[in-house]
Swiss-Prot record:
Role of this protein: Guanine nucleotide exchange factor (GEF) for RAB14. Also has some, lesser GEF activity towards RAB35.
Primary localisation category: other
Domain uDENN: 43-221
Originating gene: Dennd6b
Domain dDENN, first and last residues per copy: 375-499
Protein name (Swiss-Prot/TrEMBL): Protein DENND6B
Family designation: Belongs to the DENND6 family.
Biased composition (Low complexity): 1-10
Length: 585
């Protein structure tokens, strides 16, 4: 059914975000920062409604003094509603990702470093994009001129906690649509009482009479393919709703129509290939895009991705231009117009209407891109790409057997997730081993010389090492692994992985160098040194200490204390005038 959508978004007057007193609120906020805890989870909450004269309209933004640019407001308005052709009646949940525009966002800016240093790379805060989690309701309503009630509640965050925020919306949105503004204000105040998301901690998050219990993943977690065990309930009343994950989707449900091509899709993601996912609705498109981008874990997905994208997006021209090669982006769309617009893209995945029966849906077929010409294109993976690795038939048999035996979908998802995790690890482990061999030996790190350089990554040397230490040691899949690595070297994911590993190794080298200095006899070193050399040492030690205290260097607390003691000792040996310069009152 087609429900018309108006010409475009506008800022609607009124609403909670517009009527709240800004002067007193800002003064209090500056003094007490009452939204600091809220902003550790969310940037803001938006309500988008359909106005007969204005089209999609931003009814309110809360907290009211959170600043969105006009371009961001317009993007949120369009992305918060399904395309008119999809005709989503009832309640629909989906997500989107949009680029931030510059400028200060709020009075209570969050420092990302503490969280990002401990979080898995794939779950770090987005530095330049907003993630929008949408609950859209469209129902018949005779009291409205058009005959339909159409409204979206949107949680805007920089955290990729799709499972948590979808669960949160399923509690908040139905209540909000009944009670409107006062309910939303109460919810935001409750979130402002939550503890910050600290990686490795299990948190109890009270909301609307319910307690949601979640564990925030940590970088040091052992990668598991099964859900974590339920934590102690701590005699909480009411008993908490335990989320087994803040971010993991039901992979089996997402990949059901494309299970026979999971291997090929994994390779396309690994290589950062441009891919369009054309789905019948934004919930299907956004979940499949997020599932695709998650299948490389523990690798961080380094390309752009848009779980739901529309022709009204401010970046539409930039991402669909034919004057240059398609960008490294995964686009989730629902408008068939994109088939014509993106004919030049090398890979298009067309998904049909989801089947809710227990049987496995008809699998999409591999088709040549040349057949992608009409708006009524049939479901299929349109690509000329040939997979480097052979298909894992044993996995497909196990999943098919699970369907026949009506195995729970969460168990099916765990099987699929473990397969993808082991596949990615088998690919990455040889790279990790080779990279580790480029690290200088600890015996070559001396206190009074600059630390040695990390050896350069030589692709030919690495490829030669695969004969004895390749993925065949941990993976039964056969195929052209060498060819896959060669293509991987040209991808954004190799660049992202290498930069991250090189940065970590450089920090480790610097930390080892600091430890070597702290274990040396500094009095003996100072005996024949000029004042200039001693002052230079103080300045360098201070710089290292600041970096270490800011968690940019992996050093122990005892090393930090010893470094500070060394600085004090060295300064104490200098003339009073220099001491006054180095330690001003």
């Amino acid at each position: 059914m087609e429900v018309p959508v108006g010409p475009g978004p506008r800022q609607a007057g009124g609403g909670l975000g517009a009527t709240r007193s800004s002067s007193s609120g800002r003064a209090a906020r500056t003094a007490e920062m009452p939204w600091a805890r809220f902003s550790a989870w969310l940037e803001c909450v938006c309500v988008v409604t359909f106005d007969l004269e204005l089209g999609q309209a931003l009814e309110l933004v809360y907290p009211s003094d959170f600043r969105l640019t006009d371009k961001e407001k317009s993007s949120i308005c369009y992305l918060a509603f399904p395309d008119s052709h999809s005709g989503c009646l009832g309640d629909t949940q989906f997500s989107f990702r949009m680029r931030q525009c510059g400028g200060q966002r709020s009075l209570w800016q969050v420092d990302d470093r503490s969280y990002n240093n401990k979080a898995p790379l794939a779950l770090q805060r987005e530095p330049a994009h907003y993630l929008g989690y949408v609950y859209f309701r469209q129902v018949k309503d005779s009291s409205v001129k058009r005959g339909y009630f159409q409204k979206s509640l949107v949680l805007v965050s920089r955290l990729p906690f799709v499972r948590l925020f979808q669960s949160l919306l399923s509690l908040i949105a139905p209540e909000y649509f009944e009670k409107l503004a006062p309910c939303l204000e109460a919810v935001c105040n409750e979130i402002d009482q939550w503890p910050a998301p600290v990686p490795g901690q299990t948190l109890n998050l009270p909301i609307m009479g319910v307690v949601i219990q979640v564990r925030i993943p940590s970088r040091v977690d052992k990668l598991e393919s099964s859900p974590p065990k339920q934590c102690d309930q701590e005699n909480l009343l009411p008993a908490p709703v335990v989320l087994t994950s803040v971010h993991e989707l039901d992979l089996f449900r997402c990949f059901r129509p494309v299970l026979t091509h999971v291997q090929t899709l994994w390779e396309l993601m690994l290589l950062g290939e441009p891919l369009v996912v054309l789905a019948p609705s934004p919930d299907v498109s956004s979940e499949l895009v997020l599932a695709l981008t998650s299948c490389l874990q523990p690798l961080k997905f380094c390309c752009d991705f848009r779980p739901y994208f529309t022709i009204h997006d401010s970046e539409f021209k930039e991402l669909t231009t034919r004057t240059q090669a398609p960008p490294n982006v995964v686009l989730g769309v629902t408008n068939p117009f994109f088939i014509k617009t993106l004919q030049h893209w090398p890979h298009v995945l067309r998904i049909g209407e989801p089947k809710m029966s227990g049987d496995l849906p008809k699998q999409v077929k591999l088709k040549k891109p040349s057949r992608l010409k009409t708006l009524d294109t049939k479901p299929g993976l349109y690509t000329s790409y040939t997979a480097h690795l052979h298909r894992d038939k044993a996995l497909l048999k196990r999943l098919l057997k699970g369907v026949q035996k009506k195995r729970p979908w969460d168990v099916q998802s765990a099987l699929l997730r473990r397969h993808l995790l082991e596949l990615t690890q088998s690919f990455i482990i040889p790279l990790e081993h080779y990279m580790a061999s480029l690290m200088p030996l600890q015996k070559n790190i001396t206190p009074w010389k600059s630390p040695p350089q990390i050896c350069p990554f030589r692709q030919d040397d690495f490829l030669r090492s695969l004969e004895h230490a390749g993925p065949q040691l941990t993976c039964i899949l056969k195929g052209d692994w060498l060819g896959l690595y060669r293509r991987f070297f040209k991808s954004p994911h190799f660049d992202g992985w290498y930069r991250q590993r090189h940065k970590e190794m450089a920090q480790k080298l610097e930390a080892l160098h600091l430890e070597a200095i702290c274990e040396a006899n500094i009095e003996a070193w100072m005996k024949d040194k000029s004042e200039v050399e001693v002052v230079d040492l103080v300045l360098k030690l201070r710089e290292k200490l600041v970096r270490a205290q800011g968690h940019q260097l992996p050093v122990k607390e005892v090393t930090l204390q010893r470094a500070q003691l060394y600085i004090d000792t060295v300064i104490g040996s200098l003339p009073k005038d220099l001491q006054a310069v180095l330690c001003p009152p």
